[in-house]
Amino acid sequence: MTGVTVCCGTVNSIKALWETRIKKTKDDLKKEKEQKDRRAVGRLTGAWEDRIILAKLKEKIVTEEGRVILRIEKEEWKTLPPALVQLSQIQEWQLHRIGLQRIPRFISSFQSLIVLDLSRNSVTEIPKEIGKLTRLRELLLSYNRVSYVPEELGCCENLEKLELAMNRDLDELPTQLSNLKKLSHLDLSMNQFTTIPDCVVNLPSLEWLDMGSNILETLPDNIHRMEKLHTLWLPRNELEYLPDNISRMKSLDTLVLSKNKLRDIPPLMEGMSNLRFVNFRDNPLTYDVTLPDLNEDVEEEENDREMFGREFMNFYIQEARKRGSQNFTSVLNVMLEGVSETA
C-alpha cells in the first residue's frame, strides 16, 4: 500500500507541475498575442497619425513661379515630424513664428532645397547635416537662438544669401565659411561679434554686409580684401577708429558708421570717389564741423544727406587738416618764442 501511495503522489505532482507549465505557457502566449495586437494597433495608429500629419502638411504646400514651397506661419510646430521626408521634393521652406526649436537631421533628405527660411523661431542649433544641401542658395535664420554655426555649412557651395541677425550669443564663425565662393549677402547684425571674422573678409563674392548692433571694437587692417563689397552697415558698435585701408575699398558705395565712438575720419577717405552715401552721425568726432548753409529751396531730405553724407566727410577731413596745420604752427611759434627768450 505504501508503494502505491507513493506512486500516486508522484503522478499527481507531475500532473500538477505540467498543468502549471501549460497554464503559464498559455498565459505567455496570451500576453505575447496581446503585445503583438497592441504593437499592430500602435503601428496602425502611427500610420494613421502620419497620414493625418502628412495631409495637414500637404495643405501648406503652394507652387509659385514653378517652385514648390512649404509655407507655415503662426502655428505651433516645435518639432517637425519624420513624415515630412515623404515631401522631399519641396524646394523652399518658409516656416515663420511656429516655435520651431530644432532643425531636423533628416533635412539632408531634401536635396532639392533652394531656400531654407526659418526666421523668427526658437532654433538653437544648426545640424551638421546642413552641409549636404549643395543646392541651397538662401539660409535665413534671423531672430532665433543660434549660438554656434557648424563648419559643415561651408560645404553649401551654392549659398548666396545667409542671414543670422539677432541670435543673441553668436560671436564667431568657422573658418570653413570662406569656402562659400558665391555668398554675396550676409547679415550678422544684432549679435556679439567684436570684429569682422577672417572668414568674412575672405569671402570673394561678398557684396552686402550688415554687422550693425554688435560690439565691434576694431576693423581688420585687411578690410580692403573685400573687393566686391558695395554696402557695409556698421552702426551701433564700439569703433574708435577706422583703418587707413578702408580707403582702398574701391567698390564700396554705402558706408554706415552712425552711433560709434569715432574720434576722427582717415584723411585717405577723401579720395573715395566711389562712395555715394556715408553716415557718421552720433560719433564724438574731435572737431565740431558744420557744412556751409545750403540754398533754401533744397529739400530737407537732401539737406540731411548733405550734412551727414560724403560732403560732410570731405569737409571734415579738409577742416581737420586745416586746423591740424594751424595747431602745428601755433605750437611751433610757441617753441620758437621760448628759444628766442632763452637766447
UniProtKB/Swiss-Prot annotation:
One Gene Ontology biological process: sarcomere organization
Knockout-associated phenotype: Morpholino knockdown of the protein results in severe contractile dysfunction of the heart, leading to pericaridal edema and blood congestion. Heart development and gross cardiac morphology appear to be normal. Cardiomyocytes show some ultrastructural abnormalities including narrowing of the M-band and a poorly defined A-band/M-band transition.
Chief location bin: cytoplasm
GO CC list: M band
Alphabetical keyword list: Cytoplasm, Leucine-rich repeat, Muscle protein, Repeat
Gene3D superfamilies from the UniProt entry: Ribonuclease Inhibitor (3.80.10.10)
LRR repeat feature ranges: 64-87, 88-110, 111-133, 134-156, 158-180, 181-203, 204-226, 228-249, 250-274, 275-295
Subcellular location(s) per record: Cytoplasm, Myofibril, Sarcomere, M line
Protein function: Component of the sarcomeric M-band which plays a role in myocyte response to biomechanical stress. May regulate expression of other M-band proteins via an SRF-dependent pathway. Important for normal contractile function in heart.
PANTHER family: LEUCINE RICH REPEAT CONTAINING 39, PTHR48051
Protein name: Leucine-rich repeat-containing protein 39
The species this protein was found in: Danio rerio (Zebrafish)
